[in-house]
């Protein structure tokens, strides 16, 4: 459903990569739902931007879209809707909001990429929705960017891993350069050789995801674990 995709070591890495690709940093605001896993918000602090949380609807875990409108300012660069338990967030509603004339007039690009896009970007946390769909569209082809998780507890797993898909102007080469190394303001502990900003999915986990026997064994293991 989309040819623009790259495999990474986690959905967290994918979401952070999006912010780096867009040049998000200090002075920028990223809107996330209050009901979410920590990664959706923590990646915002990784790049030095400001988290703006929007509360859930009264009878639904999705963000309140009236509050979302109120939360958008001239500093807002990205909105991160979160899919939960296989249910896709209403990205179409968010698209309708961010393309309203009064919202478009607020958008203030900070670099050439943001200027080319010309509006707030939707970066969808799809860690829970691999294989899900909404109104005939698959998760991964709805938002500008979609981040997937292949963690051991997900419905498709490589033990550890993730992927990023996108529907914007970026070419594969630009994303793959980010995949190799991504600068971050977070300091590492002196003496450590491990670097969490090497975003590549390991070859072992990649092969696990491509091997039907390995996938079959994983499904059996998940079944036994659930029992």
Where are the model-predicted features located?
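Conserved N-terminal alpha-helix of the aminotransferase class I/II PLP-enzyme fold
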Residues: 1-10, 35
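Short beta-strand segments
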Residues: 9, 80, 222-224
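Buried hydrophobic packing segments
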Residues: 14-19, 162
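PLP-dependent aminotransferase-like
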Residues: 20-129, 133
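Active-site region of PLP-dependent enzymes
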Residues: 112, 129-135, 142-212
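PAS/LOV and related PAS-like sensory modules
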Residues: 210-227
């Amino acid at each position: 459903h989309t040819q623009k995709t790259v495999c990474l070591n986690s959905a967290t890495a994918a979401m952070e990569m999006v912010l780096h690709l867009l040049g998000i940093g200090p002075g920028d605001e990223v809107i996330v739902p209050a009901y979410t896993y920590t990664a959706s918000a923590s990646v915002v602090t990784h790049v030095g931007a400001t988290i703006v949380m929007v509360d859930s609807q009264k009878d639904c875990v999705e963000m309140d879209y009236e509050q979302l409108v109120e939360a958008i300012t001239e500093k807002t660069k990205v909105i991160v809707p979160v899919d939960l338990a296989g249910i896709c967030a209403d990205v179409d509603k968010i698209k309708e909001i961010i393309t309203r004339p009064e919202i478009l007039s607020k958008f203030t690009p900070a670099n050439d990429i943001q200027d080319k896009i010309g509006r707030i970007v939707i970066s969808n946390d799809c860690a829970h929705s691999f294989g899900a769909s909404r109104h005939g569209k698959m998760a991964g082809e709805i938002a500008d960017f979609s981040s997937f998780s292949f963690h051991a507890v997900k419905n498709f797993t490589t033990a550890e891993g993730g992927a990023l898909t996108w529907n914007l102007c970026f070419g594969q080469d630009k994303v793959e350069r980010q995949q190799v190394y991504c600068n971050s303001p977070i300091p590492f502990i002196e003496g450590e050789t491990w670097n969490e900003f090497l975003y590549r999915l390991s070859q072992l986990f990649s092969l696990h995801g491509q091997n039907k026997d390995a996938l079959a064994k994983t499904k059996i293991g998940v079944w036994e674990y659930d029992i």
